[in-house]
C-alpha cells in the first residue's frame, strides 16, 4: 500500500521531513522511506542521465526553464555538484568521485556533506569533507562509503550537498545516489513465538550527572556568555532500535551569568536510558538582552551511553570532553567536565515479561493506570537525588492489564509514511501486519503489575520533553465486573486539578498519545516527535555501541518486542512530562487560561511545533459531551497524568450558543465508533502548523495539513482530527497585534466571532445531530478499498455521500487501524437536483438547497419537501440559524487542493448560504471557484482550473507589487484600509499566498474595498457581463471561467503596469540571481512578505506571466530601504522631534531595519509608525533603495534596470556597499556641474603633459617614482598620457584606463600591506593599521591620494572599493555610529544595542579597548584615566563616540591624513565638497555590475553587422552564458577597464569624448577577436558557428594582455 503514497503531491512532501516513526526512529529506516517523484531531485537537464525516472529507461527528459534564468542557452552558468555514479554498492563498487563547479564565491571553509535524500537541515549530515584550501571554483574529491549504521536497509538514497563556508548557503546538490548494502538485516513480521526469544541481553540504566563545569567557552564581542546546559537522551543515531518513552528526556541547568568558565554547583540530573542511546549535552548562551546580537550556540557533546558505561567500569567517574560543533563552520571552543554515576540498573533477567496469550484477571485498582490517575493531579516534584532510586527491580514485576469480554490488543498507530493493513486476529491474540509494515509491532501484553512508585517520580525520570515520544496509558473502562461511575467521577476531579499544570507543560511537549479503552479493548497509540540531530559521532563508535548492546540470539525484531513490552508494562510509561524548568519563562504561551474562562474541558492531543507552540487542543463547546464521545460509555474520559483532563458528564459545556443544548448524559448512540483522534505523527519539520483559538472553537487535534495521512483513528470528540484541520483554514482573523500571529503562526478568532453551531433542537439522540456525529468519527464497517490511496489531505468522506445513522445502537468493535481519506461514509445515493453537500468548520456536513436558498442538517432524499428544509418550531432558533450562517459566510473555508492529494474530495464553503443575505450568483461564484480544487494539484485538469482562477482581476490586483502604490493614491480606500484590522489581515494573507483569496473572496468588506478602485467609466473586459440580482445588486459574470463575482473586474494593475497617472512613481527593482538553496523569487517580489511560498502558487504563476516585464519596486520595499539609511534617525527627528523620546517607536524602526519586509508587515497596523511614515511620503517614493549594502548578492546596474547577473564573482562583492544616491537627478546634475567646473578651471587640460612610461612588471614602483616627482600644479593642470614599455599603442585614453585599472588592483590590494579588507565577508578595503610597518608608508599613502585625485579629474574609474568611512575621510566629514555598519556589522550592532538600551548593572566596561598587535593583546585607554572610568548610562554616549572614533581611526590617523593630503594636492576641495560619501564613491569607483540590457542597447555595429545578425545573436548569447567575472573581463578587453560609469554604457568614454561600445565585422574566421580600447571597439570575425565564436571569444578575453599599434 505504500506505493500509493507516490501519488501524494510534492508540495507537501517536505512537510513530513521531520516525522519520526514508532517503528524505527532512524532517518534511513523503513519509517523514513519516501515515495517521491524523481523529478524532485533533479537540478538541471544535464543531470538526468544520473536518474532513473520511475524505473524507466534513461531517456531524455525536459523540464520547464524558469523565465528568470539568465542563461537561456545552456545550464553551464549554474553551480553544479556531480557524482560519478548514481548507484553504489558497499564493499563492491569503486569509490565515488564528487565533482564541483561553483559559479558563486568560494571559500577555503566550503564543505560537502552527505545527506539522506529527504534531509533539509544542513546540520544533519551523515558525513562531511572539507573541500580544501585551494580556493578553486572547480575540483573533485574521492568519497569512500563504508558499511555503517547509516545504511541499515538494503537500499538507501542519499545525496551530496555543497555549502559555502562563510554564509552557510547551499551552492549545489547532486542527484540522488542509491547505496546498496547487501549485509543489511531484513525485517520480517513477528509471530507469537518470537516474543519470548532472547530477552536477557537488554538493560535500562538509571544514572545521574552532576558536578558540571565548562572551561574556555567562546566569548562574544562585548559580553561574556551566560551559559546553561540542555541535556537530553536520544536514540542512537540511525539506530536500528525504536524510539521508546524514555527518549527525549530533557533537563536544563541553571544559568551561570557572565563567564566563560561556568561551574554548575549542587545540580544533579537523573536519566534512564539504554546503552545504545546517546547523551546529548548542548551548551547555550541565554543572552536575555532585548536584541540578541550573537549566536547562542556555544558547543555540544554527543556521547553514547555505552562509552560512559565503559569509562565507569574502569573507575572513571569524572569525565571530560572537548565540545563539538553542529556545522563544520561553527566556531566552538572549550571543554565540558561532569561526573557520571550509575544509580540503578533494570536487568531483563529480573524483569521477565510474560507474553502469554492466556487472559489473566486483575483488579483495576492494582493497575498502573489507576496508580497514575491517583497521583496525576499533584505537582511534579522537583528533582532530588533519591528520585533516581525509584527504579528498582522489585517494583516492576509482572503485571496484567484488565481484559474485557472480547479480546484485548494493543495497537500501535502507524507512522505517517507507512500505510499497512492491520487487522485484528480474533481470539488468538495475534495481529497480522501488512506486507509494507516492516518495523510495526502489534502484540498482546497481559501481565500482573505489582505496586508501583508514584507517577510523579516516574514522570520525573521519564521526562518526556521537547523532543520526546510519548506513550501515555489512559485508564479506560473497567472490566465487566467493575462499575464505571466512580472512575468517571475520579476522572472529572483529576481533570480539574491538573488543568493548570497541564497548560504549563504543554509548551514543548511532543505528540502525546493515549491508550484508551472502550468495550474492554485497549488501543495503544504511539507517536514520535524528535528533531533530527547532527551526526557528531564517528561511524565506528556507533557500530561499537550497537554491537556491544546486541546479543547473538536476539534479533532487532525480538529486541523491539521485549524492550517495548518491558517499558509499557511499567507505570513510568504512563507518566506525563514533568514541567520544563526553563522553557516556561522563555517560550510564548498563546493560550493561557482560555480553557478555564470558557469552560472547555477536553484536551485530547498535544501537537507542539517548535516554531508554533500550540496549547489549544480542546473540543468545541458545540460538541455536547453526552453525544460527542463515541467509544466511551457514559461519555467519561480518564485524565492524563499531567493534567490533560476531560470533564465527563458532570461538567456541562459552555459556549457561545450551546447553552440551550440539553445534556444527553445517558445517550450513547455513537458509542464505540472511534476512540482517539491524535495523529501518530503530527509533527512537521517544514510547515507552520496553524491553529485557531477562540471562545467558540477549540480543536482537539493537530491542525497541520501533514498530520493527516490517512491512517489515524477518528476523533472521540465532536469532530475528527481530520475535520478539525479545517479550523485552521476557516477562522477569521483577530484584531490583536499581527506580530503574535507571525511569531506563532496562529490564526486567532476574537471572542465576538462565533463559530457555527448545530441546531439545538436536533440534539435529541437519534435525529440529524446523530447523523452528523457519526460522520466525523469514521465508520466501523469499512472496506479495505480505502487503503488504496492514503493521502496527505484533510478529507475522509466521499463527495456526495452522507453519514449512516446509528440509531443509538452501540458498536462492539473499534475500527481497525487503516487509512481514511474520505469525509463521507459509503452511501452512493446521489443528492436530489439543485442540492449540494458542504462541510462547516467543525467538520459537520450540511446541505444547501440552491432553489430555496436554505440549508439543513438532514440529508435530502429524492422526495424532499418543496421548501427543502425542516423548519424549526421556534422563531428564536430560526434567528439563531440566520446569525450563525451569517458567520459561516465569513468564517467557513475549505482546505487547499494540495492537501486533498488526489482524493478529489470537494470541500466547499456556504458562501451564499441561507440566512446570510447571499444570492444565487454569490453561491455560484463560490461553487465555481471552489470547484477548482476537486482534482489533485498536479493534474492537468487542476492546472487548468488554477490558470482560470489566476485570471481573476482581484487576485492580480492584490498580489501585484504595486498594490500599495495604487492604494496610497486612493485616499478613500487608504482610509478604509488603515481603519479596518480585518481588511488588513485579509489583504496581507492574500498577498502572502494568493490561494487564500478563495477563503475571503465573498467577504463583504473585501469586495467593497476592491470595488473602490474600479473605474466604472471603462468598458468591461472581454468575456465579462454585468447583471442585477433580485435585490437590485449588481454582479459580474465571467464567461471565460464561467464564474460570477461581486468584484468589479475594471480594477487597475491587470496588465502588470500602473495606471498612467501613477507611472511616475515606478522605480524599477533589481532582480537577483538565485542559486541552489536560496529563496524563491516569488517570495522576494511579493510586496508584503518575504516568506517563501510553494512554487506553484498563484503568485508564482502571476510572477511567471509577467517575468519579461520590468516589475516595479513594491512600496514596502521602498519603506524598508528608506529606513535603512545610515542617518535615518536624524532625518526622522527633523520632522518629528518627539522621536528622540519615543524609545518604543525607535525600537520598531530598528526592528524594520533588521527584519526588512517581514518586520514591516508585522508592524503595518501600528498607528505611530504609520503616522511617522506618512510625513515622508514623497521622500519614500523618490528614494532609490540602498539595496546592495544590505543584500550583497544584489546586482546594481547603472540605471537600476532589471538585470540578472547569473553569478556574483568574488570581485563583484567588493561593490556590496555601493549604491546610487537617494536623489538620482540631483546627483547627475552635481556630476555634470563638477566636470564642467573642472574643465573651466583648467584641471587636466594642458597644454603640459604628464607622460608616464610604465613597465608592466614594475607597475607600482615605476608609477610611484614618476608621479611623486611631479609638482602639485603639474598634477592639476597637465594632461595625462600613459605608455607601456614595449607596446606601441597610442594613448587615446585606452592605455590610461587600463593603467588605472591595473594600478588600483595592485596599490589597493590588501596583500601589499597598505590596505586591508574591512571584514571577512566583504571585499571593501580600508587603511590597514599594519601599514605603519611598511617602509616609507606615509609617502605611499600620499601617492595613493594623488592617484585617486588623478583618476577623478581625468574621469577614469578605479577598480577598488573602499568603506564608507574612507570616503568620509576624503571629504573630511566626521564619522558617526551608522558608518560602522559598513565597516563591521557586528561591532555596529553591539554599540547600537548599548545606545538603545539601559546598561545599568548589565555591562562591566571601562573606557579602554583591547588591541592585538602581532598576536600580543594590549589595553589602550580611550581617554585619559579611562581604565578607571566605568561606562554608565550617563556617559555611554561619550563611550560610543570614542569607540566609533577608535574603530575608524585605530592606528591609521597618520596614514589617513597623508592620503587626504595627497588627494587634495590634485583636486580642489571646494569642488569635491558638493558630493556626499556615497556620491563620491560612485564618481571614483563607478559600479562593477553588468547590465546586459543596457550594454546591448548602447552597442553600435559596423561592417555589415546589425542587432539581428546571426553572428551578433551568437555573440550576445555567449555574453549571457558568461558569468559576471567573464563579462567584466570582456569589457576590460574591449574598453580597458572593467568598471562602468554611473550613467551606464551610454556614458562610456573614448579618446575624444563619449564613445559607445562597438562591434565591427572584421577578419578571417581563423583569427581571434581584436579590441581597440581607445575607441571601445571589438573586431569580430564572422564565425560560422556558435561554438567557434564562443571558444574564440573566451580565448581572447582570458589570454590577451598587451596592446599593439595598427
UniProtKB/Swiss-Prot annotation:
Regions of compositional bias (Basic and acidic residues) in chain numbering: 380-392, 589-600
C2 domain: residues covered: 182-318
Primary location: cytoplasm
Coiled coil: 870-901
Gene3D superfamilies xrefs: 2.20.70.10, 2.60.40.2840, C2 domain, Hect, E3 ligase catalytic domain, Hect, E3 ligase catalytic domains
GO biological process: negative regulation of canonical Wnt signaling pathway; protein ubiquitination; regulation of dendrite morphogenesis; ubiquitin-dependent protein catabolic process
InterPro entries: C2_dom (IPR000008), C2_domain_sf (IPR035892), C2_HECW (IPR037795), E3_ubiq-protein_ligase (IPR050409), HECT_dom (IPR000569), Hect_E3_ubiquitin_ligase (IPR035983), HECW1_helix (IPR040524), HECW_N (IPR032348)
Pathway: Protein modification; protein ubiquitination
One Pfam family per UniProt: HECW_N
Annotated EC: 2.3.2.26
Active site: 1574
GO (cellular component) term, any one: cytoplasm
Segments forming domain WW: 829-862, 1018-1051
Sorted UniProt keywords: Coiled coil, Cytoplasm, Phosphoprotein, Repeat, Transferase, Ubl conjugation pathway
Region of interest called Disordered, as start-end residue ranges on this chain: 349-418, 459-538, 566-672, 730-815, 894-938
Highest taxon of source: Eukaryota
Sequence positions bearing Phosphoserine: 874, 937, 939
Sequence ranges of Polar residues compositional bias: 354-373, 651-663, 751-765, 806-815
Subcellular location: Cytoplasm
Catalysis performed (reactions): S-ubiquitinyl-[E2 ubiquitin-conjugating enzyme]-L-cysteine + [acceptor protein]-L-lysine = [E2 ubiquitin-conjugating enzyme]-L-cysteine + N(6)-ubiquitinyl-[acceptor protein]-L-lysine
Top EC class of this enzyme: transferase
Tissues expressing this chain: Predominantly expressed in neurons of adult and fetal brain. Weakly expressed in the kidney.
UniProt subunit comment: Interacts with DVL1 and SSR3. Also interacts with mutant SOD1.
Function: E3 ubiquitin-protein ligase that mediates ubiquitination and subsequent degradation of DVL1. Also targets the mutant SOD1 protein involved in familial amyotrophic lateral sclerosis (FALS). Forms cytotoxic aggregates with DVL1, SSR3 and mutant SOD1 that lead to motor neuron death in FALS.
Name this protein carries in UniProt: E3 ubiquitin-protein ligase HECW1
Lineage, uppermost ranks: Eukaryota, Metazoa, Chordata, Craniata, Vertebrata
Gene: HECW1
Amino acid at each position: 500500500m505504500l506505493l500509493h503514497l507516490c501519488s501524494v503531491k510534492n508540495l507537501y512532501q517536505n512537510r513530513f521531513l521531520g516525522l519520526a516513526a514508532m517503528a524505527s526512529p532512524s532517518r534511513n529506516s523503513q519509517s523514513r522511506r519516501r515515495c517521491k517523484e524523481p523529478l524532485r531531485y533533479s537540478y538541471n537537464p544535464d543531470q538526468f542521465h544520473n536518474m532513473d525516472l520511475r524505473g524507466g529507461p534513461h531517456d531524455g527528459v525536459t523540464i520547464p526553464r524558469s523565465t528568470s534564468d539568465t542563461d537561456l542557452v545552456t545550464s553551464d552558468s549554474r553551480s553544479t555538484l556531480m557524482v560519478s555514479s548514481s548507484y553504489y554498492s558497499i564493499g563492491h563498487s569503486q569509490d565515488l568521485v564528487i565533482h564541483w563547479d561553483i559559479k558563486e564565491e568560494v571559500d577555503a571553509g566550503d564543505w560537502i556533506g552527505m545527506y539522506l535524500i529527504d534531509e533539509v537541515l544542513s546540520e544533519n549530515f551523515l558525513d562531511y569533507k572539507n573541500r580544501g584550501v585551494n580556493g578553486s571554483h572547480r575540483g573533485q574529491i574521492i568519497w569512500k562509503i563504508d558499511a555503517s549504521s547509516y545504511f541499515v536497509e538494503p537500499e538507501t538514497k542519499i545525496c551530496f550537498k555543497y555549502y559555502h563556508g562563510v554564509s552557510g548557503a547551499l551552492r549545489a546538490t547532486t542527484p540522488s545516489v542509491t547505496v546498496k548494502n547487501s549485509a543489511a538485516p531484513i525485517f520480517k513480521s513477528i509471530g507469537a513465538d518470537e516474543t519470548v526469544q532472547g530477552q536477557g541481553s537488554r538493560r535500562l540504566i538509571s544514572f545521574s550527572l552532576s558536578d558540571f563545569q565548562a572551561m574556555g567557552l567562546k566569548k562574544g564581542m562585548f559580553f561574556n556568555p551566560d551559559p546553561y546546559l540542555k541535556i537530553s537522551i536520544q536514540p542512537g543515531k540511525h539506530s536500528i532500535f525504536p524510539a521508546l518513552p524514555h527518549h527525549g528526556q530533557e533537563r536544563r541547568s541553571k544559568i551561570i551569568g557572565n563567564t566563560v568558565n561556568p561551574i554548575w554547583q549542587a545540580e544533579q540530573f537523573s536519566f534512564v536510558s539504554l546503552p545504545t542511546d546517546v547523551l546529548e549535552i548542548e551548551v547555550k548562551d541565554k543572552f536575555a538582552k532585548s536584541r540578541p546580537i550573537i549566536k547562542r550556540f556555544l558547543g555540544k557533546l554527543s556521547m553514547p551511553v555505552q562509552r560512559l558505561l565503559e569509562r565507569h567500569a574502569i573507575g572513571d567517574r569524572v569525565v571530560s570532553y572537548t565540545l563539538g560543533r553542529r556545522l563544520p563552520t561553527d566556531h566552538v571552543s572549550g571543554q565540558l567536565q561532569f561526573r557520571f554515576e550509575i544509580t540503578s540498573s533494570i536487568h531483563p533477567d529480573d524483569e521477565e515479561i510474560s507474553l502469554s496469550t492466556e487472559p489473566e484477571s486483575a483488579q483495576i485498582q492494582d493497575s498502573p493506570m489507576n496508580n497514575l490517575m491517583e497521583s496525576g493531579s499533584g505537582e511534579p516534584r522537583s528533582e532530588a537525588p533519591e528520585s533516581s532510586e525509584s527504579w528498582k527491580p522489585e517494583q516492576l514485576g509482572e503485571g496484567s492489564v484488565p481484559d474485557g469480554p472480547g479480546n484485548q490488543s494493543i495497537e500501535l498507530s502507524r507512522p505517517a509514511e507507512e500505510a499497512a493493513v492491520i487487522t485484528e486476529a480474533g481470539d488468538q491474540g495475534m495481529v497480522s501486519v501488512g506486507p509494507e509494515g516492516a518495523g510495526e509491532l502489534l502484540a498482546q501484553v497481559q501481565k500482573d503489575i505489582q505496586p508501583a512508585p508514584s507517577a510523579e517520580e516516574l514522570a520525573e525520570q521519564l521526562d518526556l520533553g521537547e523532543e520526546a515520544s510519548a506513550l501515555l496509558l489512559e485508564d479506560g473502562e473497567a472490566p465487566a465486573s467493575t462499575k464505571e461511575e466512580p472512575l468517571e467521577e475520579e476522572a472529572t476531579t483529576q481533570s480539574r486539578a491538573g488543568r493548570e499544570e497541564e497548560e504549563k507543560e504543554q509548551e514543548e511537549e511532543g505528540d502525546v498519545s493515549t491508550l484508551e479503552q472502550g468495550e474492554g479493548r485497549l488501543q495503544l497509540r504511539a507517536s514520535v516527535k524528535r528533531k533530527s540531530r547532527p551526526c557528531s559521532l564517528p561511524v565506528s563508535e556507533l557500530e561499537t555501541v550497537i554491537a556491544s548492546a546486541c546479543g547473538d540470539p536476539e534479533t532487532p525484531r525480538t529486541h523491539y518486542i521485549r524492550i517495548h513490552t518491558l517499558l509499557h508494562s511499567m507505570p513510568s510509561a504512563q507518566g506525563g512530562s514533568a514541567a520544563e524548568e526553563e522553557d516556561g519563562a522563555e517560550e510564548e504561551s498563546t493560550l493561557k487560561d482560555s480553557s478555564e474562562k470558557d469552560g472547555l474541558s477536553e484536551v485530547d492531543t498535544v501537537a507542539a511545533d517548535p516554531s508554533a507552540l500550540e496549547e489549544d487542543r480542546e473540543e468545541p463547546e458545540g460538541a455536547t459531551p453526552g453525544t460527542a464521545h463515541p467509544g466511551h460509555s457514559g461519555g467519561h474520559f480518564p485524565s492524563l497524568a499531567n493534567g490533560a483532563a476531560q470533564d465527563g458528564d458532570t461538567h456541562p459545556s459552555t459556549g457561545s450558543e450551546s447553552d440551550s443544548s440539553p445534556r444527553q448524559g445517558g445517550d450513547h448512540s455513537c458509542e464505540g465508533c472511534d476512540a482517539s483522534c491524535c495523529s501518530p505523527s503530527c509533527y512537521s519539520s517544514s510547515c507552520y502548523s496553524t491553529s485557531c483559538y477562540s471562545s467558540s472553537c477549540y480543536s482537539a487535534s493537530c491542525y497541520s495539513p501533514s498530520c493527516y495521512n490517512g491512517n489515524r483513528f477518528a476523533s472521540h470528540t465532536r469532530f475528527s482530527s481530520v475535520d478539525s484541520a479545517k479550523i485552521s483554514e476557516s477562522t477569521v482573523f483577530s484584531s490583536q497585534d499581527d506580530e503574535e500571529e507571525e511569531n506563532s503562526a496562529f490564526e486567532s478568532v476574537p471572542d465576538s466571532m462565533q463559530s457555527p453551531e448545530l441546531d439545538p433542537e436536533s440534539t435529541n439522540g437519534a435525529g440529524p445531530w446523530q447523523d452528523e456525529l457519526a460522520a466525523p468519527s469514521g465508520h466501523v464497517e469499512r472496506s479495505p478499498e480505502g487503503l488504496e490511496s492514503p493521502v496527505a489531505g484533510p478529507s475522509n468522506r466521499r463527495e456526495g455521500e452522507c453519514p449512516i445513522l446509528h440509531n443509538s445502537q452501540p458498536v462492539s468493535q473499534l475500527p481497525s487501524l487503516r487509512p481514511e481519506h474520505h469525509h463521507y461514509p459509503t452511501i452512493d445515493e446521489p443528492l436530489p437536483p439543485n442540492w449540494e453537500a458542504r462541510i462547516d468548520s467543525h467538520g459537520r456536513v450540511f446541505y444547501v438547497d440552491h432553489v430555496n436558498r436554505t440549508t439543513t442538517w438532514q440529508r435530502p432524499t429524492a422526495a424532499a419537501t418543496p421548501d427543502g428544509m425542516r423548519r424549526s418550531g421556534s422563531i428564536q432558533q430560526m434567528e439563531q440559524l440566520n446569525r450563525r450562517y451569517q458567520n459561516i459566510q465569513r468564517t467557513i473555508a475549505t482546505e487547499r487542493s494540495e492537501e486533498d492529494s488526489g482524493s478529489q474530495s470537494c470541500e466547499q464553503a456556504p458562501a451564499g448560504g441561507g440566512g446570510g443575505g447571499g444570492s444565487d450568483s454569490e453561491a455560484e461564484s463560490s461553487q465555481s471557484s471552489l470547484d477548482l480544487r476537486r482534482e489533485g494539484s498536479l493534474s492537468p485538469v487542476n492546472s487548468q482550473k488554477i490558470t482560470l482562477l489566476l485570471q481573476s482581476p482581484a487576485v492580480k490586483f492584490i498580489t501585484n507589487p504595486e498594490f500599495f502604490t495604487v492604494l496610497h493614491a486612493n485616499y478613500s480606500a487608504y482610509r478604509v484600509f488603515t481603519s479596518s484590522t480585518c481588511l488588513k489581515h485579509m489583504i496581507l494573507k492574500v498577498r502572502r499566498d494568493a490561494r487564500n483569496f478563495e477563503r475571503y473572496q465573498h467577504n463583504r468588506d473585501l469586495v467593497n474595498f476592491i470595488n473602490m478602485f474600479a473605474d466604472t467609466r471603462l468598458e468591461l473586459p472581454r468575456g465579462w457581463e454585468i447583471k442585477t440580482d433580485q435585490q437590485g445588486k449588481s454582479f459580474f459574470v465571467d464567461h471565460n471561467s464561467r464564474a460570477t463575482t461581486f468584484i468589479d473586474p475594471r480594477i487597475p494593475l491587470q496588465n502588470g503596469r500602473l495606471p498612467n497617472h501613477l507611472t511616475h512613481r515606478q522605480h524599477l527593482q533589481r532582480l537577483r540571481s538565485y542559486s541552489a538553496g536560496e529563496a524563491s523569487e516569488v517570495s522576494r517580489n511579493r510586496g508584503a512578505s518575504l516568506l517563501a511560498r510553494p512554487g506553484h502558487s498563484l503568485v508564482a504563476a502571476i510572477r511567471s506571466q509577467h517575468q519579461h516585464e520590468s516589475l516595479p519596486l513594491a512600496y514596502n520595499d521602498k519603506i524598508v530601504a528608506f529606513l535603512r539609511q545610515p542617518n535615518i534617525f536624524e532625518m526622522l527627528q527633523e520632522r518629528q522631534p518627539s522621536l528622540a523620546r519615543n524609545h518604543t517607536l525607535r525600537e520598531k524602526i530598528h526592528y524594520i531595519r533588521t527584519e526588512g519586509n517581514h518586520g514591516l508587515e508585522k508592524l503595518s497596523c501600528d498607528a505611530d509608525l504609520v503616522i511617522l511614515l506618512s510625513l515622508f511620503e514623497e521622500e519614500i517614493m523618490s528614494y532609490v533603495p540602498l539595496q546592495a549594502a544590505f543584500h550583497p548578492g544584489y546586482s546594481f546596474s547603472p540605471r537600476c534596470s532589471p538585470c540578472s547577473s547569473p553569478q556574483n564573482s568574488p570581485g563583484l562583492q567588493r561593490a556590496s556597499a555601493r549604491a546610487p544616491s537617494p536623489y538620482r537627478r540631483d546627483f547627475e546634475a552635481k556630476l555634470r556641474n563638477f566636470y564642467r567646473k573642472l574643465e573651466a578651471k583648467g584641471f587636466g587640460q594642458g597644454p603640459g603633459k604628464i607622460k608616464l612610461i610604465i613597465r608592466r612588471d614594475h607597475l607600482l614602483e615605476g608609477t610611484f617614482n614618476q608621479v611623486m616627482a611631479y609638482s602639485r600644479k603639474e598634477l592639476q593642470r597637465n594632461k595625462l598620457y600613459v605608455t607601456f614599455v614595449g607596446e606601441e599603442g597610442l594613448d587615446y585614453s585606452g592605455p590610461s584606463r587600463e593603467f588605472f585599472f591595473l594600478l588600483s588592483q595592485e596599490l589597493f590590494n590588501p596583500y601589499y600591506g597598505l590596505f586591508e579588507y574591512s571584514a571577512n565577508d566583504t571585499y571593501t578595503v580600508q587603511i590597514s593599521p599594519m601599514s605603519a610597518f611598511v617602509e616609507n608608508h606615509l609617502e605611499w599613502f600620499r601617492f595613493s591620494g594623488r592617484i585617486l585625485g588623478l583618476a577623478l579629474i581625468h574621469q577614469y574609474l578605479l577598480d577598488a572599493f573602499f568603506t564608507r568611512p574612507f570616503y568620509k575621510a576624503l571629504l573630511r566629514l566626521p564619522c558617526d555610529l551608522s558608518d560602522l555598519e559598513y565597516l563591521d556589522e557586528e561591532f555596529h550592532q553591539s554599540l547600537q544595542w548599548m545606545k538603545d538600551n539601559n546598561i545599568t548593572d548589565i555591562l562591566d566596561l571601562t573606557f579602554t579597548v583591547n588591541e592585538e598587535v602581532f598576536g600580543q593583546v594590549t589595553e589602550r585607554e580611550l581617554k585619559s584615566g579611562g581604565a578607571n572610568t566605568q561606562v554608565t548610562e550617563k556617559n555611554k554616549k561619550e563611550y560610543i563616540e570614542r569607540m566609533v572614533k577608535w574603530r575608524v581611526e585605530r592606528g591609521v590617523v597618520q596614514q589617513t591624513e597623508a592620503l587626504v593630503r595627497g588627494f587634495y594636492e590634485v583636486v580642489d576641495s571646494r569642488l569635491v565638497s558638493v558630493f556626499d560619501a556615497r556620491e563620491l564613491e560612485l564618481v571614483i569607483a563607478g559600479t562593477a555590475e553588468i547590465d546586459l540590457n543596457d550594454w546591448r542597447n548602447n552597442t553600435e555595429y559596423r561592417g555589415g553587422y546589425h542587432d539581428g545578425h546571426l553572428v551578433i545573436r551568437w555573440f550576445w548569447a555567449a555574453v549571457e552564458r558568461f558569468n559576471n567575472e567573464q563579462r567584466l573581463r570582456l569589457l576590460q578587453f574591449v574598453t580597458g577597464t572593467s568598471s562602468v560609469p554611473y550613467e551606464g554604457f551610454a556614458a562610456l568614454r573614448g579618446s575624444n569624448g563619449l564613445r559607445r561600445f562597438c562591434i565591427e565585422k572584421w577578419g578571417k574566421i581563423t583569427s581571434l577577436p581584436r579590441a581597440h580600447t581607445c575607441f571601445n571597439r571589438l573586431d569580430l570575425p564572422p564565425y560560422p558557428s556558435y561554438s567557434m565564436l564562443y571558444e574564440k571569444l573566451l580565448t581572447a578575453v582570458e589570454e590577451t594582455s598587451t596592446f599593439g599599434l595598427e
